[in-house]
C-alpha cells in the first residue's frame, strides 16, 4: 500500500535543508545521503545526490522523469555475479 495522500511525500529533513541551501546559492555539489526512502521532489531536479547502497555512495543525477520515485530505486543494493557456465558444470560432473 502507498503512503496516504494527506501526509504528502517523505523527504529527509536534513536532505531537504541541503537542497534548499544549494538552490539559494545556485551551487551544484554532490550531496551524500543514506536516506534511500526519500521521495524525489521538483526542488531536487538538476542536483546530483550520492545514495548509499550498503557498500558505497552511488551518484544519481536527478531529472524530471524521476519525480515521485524514491532515491533508493536508482542505487541497486545487490550484485549479480552471473549464472554458472554450462560447460564448466559438465566438466565438474564427469570428473
UniProtKB/Swiss-Prot annotation:
Keyword vocabulary terms for this entry: Ribonucleoprotein, Ribosomal protein, RNA-binding, rRNA-binding
Disulfide feature: none
Cellular component annotations (GO), alphabetically ordered: cytoplasm; small ribosomal subunit
Source species, domain of life: Bacteria
Pfam name, any one: Ribosomal_S19
Ribosomal protein found in the keyword field: yes
GO BP term (any one): ribosomal small subunit assembly
Gene3D superfamilies listed in its UniProt record: 30s Ribosomal Protein S19, Chain A
UniProt keyword rRNA-binding present: yes
Similarity annotation: Belongs to the universal ribosomal protein uS19 family.
Protein name per UniProt: Small ribosomal subunit protein uS19
Organism: Thermotoga petrophila (strain ATCC BAA-488 / DSM 13995 / JCM 10881 / RKU-1)
